[in-house]
Amino acid sequence: MPAPYEKGSEKKDANLFKTRCLQCHTVEKGGPHKVGPNLHGIFGRKSGQAAGYSYTDANKKKGVEWTEQTMSDYLENPKKYIPGTKMAFGGLKKPKDRNDLITYLANATK
């Protein structure tokens, strides 16, 4: 079972986002979809729901509401959490890295 989410370091994770996520995702309001969807407003939204992005059926049918904890569970191993997702990212195995990234995302995607 994945470790529980704990608030991390937003500064450390801005760099993690740039090196691990930015090539496929944007976070700013009105930002474009890239290979992956724009993540603005993701917390509180259900999986597969960003307007204008073409999700796999697996993402649409998962129906999970994104919270800090569900995002942590997903980012540990995306393909295990949502079998059939097209997200190619292998995941973040270290709970601290996930916590830092999610802390950054929670602020950057408001």
From Swiss-Prot:
Molecular function, one GO term: metal ion binding
Subcellular location, record wording: Mitochondrion intermembrane space
Record flagged with keyword DNA-binding: no
Modification sites for N6,N6,N6-trimethyllysine: K79
GO cellular component: mitochondrial intermembrane space
Processing after translation: Binds 1 heme c group covalently per subunit.
Keywords associated with the record: Electron transport, Heme, Iron, Metal-binding, Methylation, Mitochondrion, Respiratory chain, Transport
Positions that bind heme c: C21, C24, H25, M87
SUPFAM superfamilies: Cytochrome c
Functional summary from the UniProt entry: Electron carrier protein. The oxidized form of the cytochrome c heme group can accept an electron from the heme group of the cytochrome c1 subunit of cytochrome reductase. Cytochrome c then transfers this electron to the cytochrome oxidase complex, the final protein carrier in the mitochondrial electron-transport chain.
Family per similarity comment: Belongs to the cytochrome c family.
Protein name: Cytochrome c
Gene: CYC1
